[in-house]
A protein has these predicted regions:
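Walker B catalytic acidic pair
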Residues: 167
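Active-site-proximal or metal-binding-adjacent scaffold patches in catalytic folds
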Residues: 1-161, 171-208
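Walker B beta-strand of ABC/ABC-like P-loop ATPase nucleotide-binding domains
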Residues: 164
Length: 208
């Protein structure tokens, strides 16, 4: 619903428009709110990943513009000064720091998973690298180097597999042809379309 700046209708007319479009407006508001809060960092937030939990905690003993990291068992705690978390620049820096920490602590798991899936399908890869991009979650070079983003660690297990299997299919078809999708679907045990659709709807809890 668009109301131009030169609109001269009555308040009652505007109310009637809102009532007529109430359901659609609710859906739009819900979608916008979910997208906004999904990638927002705040005190007490817990982010669940396959390996465990990421906990964000405000702590007055932490110096300004600093982050203290503690790992115990299956949890990594990121502590920061309470006054910092309201800063958009600090949130951006904290997001980058969290992703670096994930890559350092769990990047080896993505490498192992990629090698295991390649071996399962009888594929040979030259190397596995861990990237940090959010827009491009995976890449396969013509020389057989597979790059998997650390952001994949934020995905559930089956979507991690989808990203990796998608790139492994590029070892055979360096395009997105019908043959490529047929092979990718084979690797995904018939779930390629469903997993692709699920990935498109996934809201990452951390955004750069």
């Amino acid at each position: 619903m668009v109301v131009p700046f030169y609109f001269e209708g009555t308040t009652e007319y505007l109310r009637s428009l809102v009532e007529q479009n109430r359901d659609a407006l609710k859906r739009l508001l819900s979608k916008a709110t979910t997208h906004h809060t999904g990638s927002q960092l705040y005190d007490g937030r817990q982010i669940e990943i396959v390996e465990g939990t990421l906990l964000l905690r405000a702590d007055n003993s932490v110096g300004r513009s600093r982050v203290r990291t503690r790992r115990e068992d299956n949890r990594i705690t990121f502590s920061f000064h309470p006054d910092d978390i309201t800063s958009s620049s600090f949130q951006a820096g904290l997001s980058r720091y969290i992703m670096r920490t994930l890559a350092t602590n769990y990047g080896a798991r993505l490498r192992q998973m990629t090698n295991d899936l390649a071996s399962q399908w009888g594929l040979k890869i030259k190397a596995v690298r861990i990237g940090r991009g959010q827009r491009v979650l995976g890449h396969c070079s013509r020389t057989g180097i597979i790059t998997i983003s650390a952001f994949v660690l934020l995905l559930p297990q089956h979507l991690r597999e989808y990203i990796i299997l998608h790139e492994l299919a590029h070892l055979t078809h360096f395009n997105h042809s019908t043959a490529f999708h047929a092979l990718c679907n084979k690797y995904c045990q018939g779930n390629e379309a469903a997993w692709r659709g699920e990935l498109r709807k996934f809201v990452f809890p951390i955004s750069l």
